[in-house]
């Protein structure tokens, strides 16, 4: 009897000991799965004009600047005039660097991007020897912002460029196979009205390798370069800094020369 009582007593003590043990809280661990990271595929930016930040002067043997050259040229029949009413004649649209549009008898190039560059080439205007003049009217322009006339253009990497700055300078550039050079580097001229608003009449005579350049009926310079013999004509605008640049072109006249 006493032995049975002892066994029952020890059993109850064991149960009480187990009841006093701390509870173990087993939490379920979340399963972490790696989410793949999306890879951004870069969108290529269309290059509308070859970079020409660094200009290399032509070798002395191929460079000829003759400001005193005879500028009396006989013009025969007019090849065409453009009063900028037909949008089919020019490259127009909204581009990465700004807007090109026709309106009010003007072709307007508005650069909206820092150091942006816009240009427009006239369709089906392949010229070799000619006299051309066009009016340029900058409305937003400052400092070394540039605008001007392109000719003998056969590709984005082959043409001549008559460039005017908004602080009264000009230069003549040549791009050949994508490489830029300056037969006539930046030169100050009192014939170029600085700033905006202003207006200038830009003119070019091209006869073979001989080329002459004018602003407002004043002869600026002449160069001799046989590299590019023919091509289309066009206009351009370049922003030198972060500010917008807007230039409108009008009254384009192109003549044959004797």
Predicted segments, located by residue:
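Ser/Thr-rich, Proline-interspersed low-complexity disordered segments
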Residues: 20-77
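Short tryptophan-centered beta-strand motifs in secreted/extracellular beta-sheet-rich domains
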Residues: 84, 132-134, 198-213
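Extracellular beta-strand elements of beta-rich domains used
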Residues: 84, 250-254
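Extracellular glycan-recognition surfaces and repeat-rich motifs
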Residues: 87-116
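Secretory/extracellular carbohydrate-interaction modules
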Residues: 112-176
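Short, aromatic/His-centered strand-loop micro-motif at the edge of beta-sheets
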Residues: 178-201
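Short strand-turn-strand beta-turns centered on an Asx-Gly dipeptide
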Residues: 214-218
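Flexible glycan-contacting loops in extracellular carbohydrate-active proteins
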Residues: 223-248
């Amino acid at each position: 009897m006493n032995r049975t009582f002892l066994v029952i007593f020890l059993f109850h003590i064991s149960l009480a000991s187990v009841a006093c043990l701390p509870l173990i809280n087993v939490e379920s661990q979340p399963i972490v799965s790696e989410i793949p990271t999306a890879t951004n595929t870069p969108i290529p930016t269309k290059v509308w004009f070859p970079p020409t930040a660094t200009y290399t002067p032509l070798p002395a043997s191929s460079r000829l600047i003759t400001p005193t050259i005879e500028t009396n040229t006989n013009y025969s029949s007019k090849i065409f005039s453009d009063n900028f009413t037909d949008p089919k004649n020019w490259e127009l649209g909204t581009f990465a660097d700004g807007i090109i549009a026709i309106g009010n008898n003007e072709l307007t190039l508005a650069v909206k991007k820092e150091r942006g560059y816009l240009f427009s080439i006239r369709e089906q205007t392949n010229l070799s020897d000619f006299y051309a003049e066009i009016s340029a009217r900058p409305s937003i322009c400052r400092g070394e912002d540039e605008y001007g006339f392109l000719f003998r253009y056969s590709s984005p990497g082959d043409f001549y460029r008559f460039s005017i700055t908004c602080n009264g300078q000009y230069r003549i550039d040549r791009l050949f196979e994508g490489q830029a050079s300056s037969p006539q580097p930046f030169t100050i001229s009192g014939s170029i009205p600085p700033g905006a608003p202003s207006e200038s009449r830009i003119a070019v005579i091209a006869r073979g390798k001989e080329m002459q350049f004018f602003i407002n009926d004043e002869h600026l310079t002449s160069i001799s370069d046989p590299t590019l013999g023919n091509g289309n004509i066009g206009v351009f605008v370049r922003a030198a800094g972060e500010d917008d640049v807007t230039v409108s072109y009008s009254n384009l006249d192109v003549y044959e020369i004797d």
